[in-house]
Amino acid sequence: MFLRHFIVFSFIALLAGCAGFGARESVQGQGNPAQWRLHKDQLTGLDGWQINGKIGIRAPKDSGSGTLFWLQRQDYYDIRLSGPLGRGAARLTGRPGQVSLEVANQGRYESASPETLLEEQLGWKLPVSHLAWWVRGLPAPDSKSRLTLDGDSHLASLEQDGWQVEYSSYSQQNGYWLPERIKLNGSDLDVTLVIKEWLPRKLGQ
């Protein structure tokens, strides 16, 4: 009797766990979901990095390419774009609730939301708050997502909040498998990130 109850309880617990996992993420593709969860847990703990690379942006009113520098220290970020991006260099810095945008030959602007700043000053509807997750090859945790895994159980693509994100290559840096090339499409905006240098660092414990 005890064994039967234990089996029934374990089965119910398993179903509850699967339901909880699927409530936020729908996973498909070639990869192993268990390996994906391990990979995801490792990257979720990565809260510091420096990125150097290139960015290409195609928007209804302006398009161009330039260089990308991104410094992340837990909830603080410093993202710099420079080169022929149509509007010159731009620097976005801040943390949740306190964000500043500096645009060459225009000035400095502040807001509680990075999305609001970019849309008002540059005309880009870009989910900046999701980018810290997407750039690591992870879905943002606060909304539903549809994931496709590659043969290594890393993200090949994800769909979230009206955006399609594709990952075409990864490299291993300091024990982390991190994206090298990312394409984002949504809200009349196409963005390509080519990451030349990843310097990942786990800061918090």
Swiss-Prot record:
Cellular compartments per GO CC: cell outer membrane
Keywords: Cell outer membrane, Chaperone, Lipoprotein, Membrane, Palmitate, Protein transport, Signal, Transport
Signal peptide: 1-17
Protein's membrane topology: Lipid-anchor
PROSITE patterns cross-referenced by the UniProt entry: PROKAR_LIPOPROTEIN (PS51257)
GO biological process: lipoprotein localization to outer membrane; protein transport
Lipidation (N-palmitoyl cysteine): C18
Tree of life domain: Bacteria
InterPro entries listed in its UniProt record: LolA/LolB/LppX, OM_lipoprot_LolB
Lipidation (S-diacylglycerol cysteine): C18
Main location: membrane
Quaternary context: Monomer.
NCBIfam families per record: lolB
Family of the protein in this entry: Belongs to the LolB family.
Protein name: Outer-membrane lipoprotein LolB
Source organism of the structure: Pseudomonas fluorescens (strain ATCC BAA-477 / NRRL B-23932 / Pf-5)
Species classification: Bacteria, Pseudomonadati, Pseudomonadota, Gammaproteobacteria, Pseudomonadales
